[in-house]
Amino acid sequence: MSKKQNTAPTILVVEPDNDVRPLLRTNLHRQGYRVIVTLDEEDAIARARGDGDRPDLILINQYRLPLDKVVNIGRRIRQDAGLPNDTPIVIMAERYGEDMEGKDVKVGESDYVTYLEDGEQLMNLLRRLCPV
């Protein structure tokens, strides 16, 4: 990961939901992360390519899209922004059965889908993949 010496890791958040976006940003800041918040794939690629911080992790909310499409969006962001192939992608699943609740499923070399039971589960996964 591109963690800079004495600099908190940076998470690129793709969150189209206006209600969730500020909460997610605040919670990630409280955990010690630097946060780049974007609304969609195009915005995420532009921000990740920019002159500012390069993300150490990509966090995407499924938000009404099929899960496989969201995984592909994450992979395109990583590729088109020129991020390392081992940059983790975490998808927050929106729709799932009770049997999946509380699970983190690896769907690629460094790609994960998290079926959230609570916010602490997400923070634990992020700390494991991108320690502060």
Annotated model-derived regions:
Residues 1-19, 54, 85, 114, ...:
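Non-catalytic signal-transmission and effector/linker regions of two-component phosphorelay proteins
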Residues 16, 62, 91-96, 115-116:
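Conserved active-site segment of CheY-like receiver
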Residues 18-37:
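Two-component/phosphorelay signaling modules centered on CheY-like receiver
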Residues 26-31, 47-49, 103:
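Alpha-helical interaction/dimerization surfaces of two-component signaling modules
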Residues 39-57:
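Acidic, metal-coordinating helix/loop segments flanking the phosphotransfer/catalytic sites
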Residues 43, 65, 82, 94-99:
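Negatively charged, flexible loop motifs adjacent to catalytic sites
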Residues 59-80, 84-85:
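Conserved phosphotransfer microenvironments
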Residues 68-72, 93-114:
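Alpha4 helix (beta4-alpha4-beta5 surface) of REC/receiver domains from two-component response regulators
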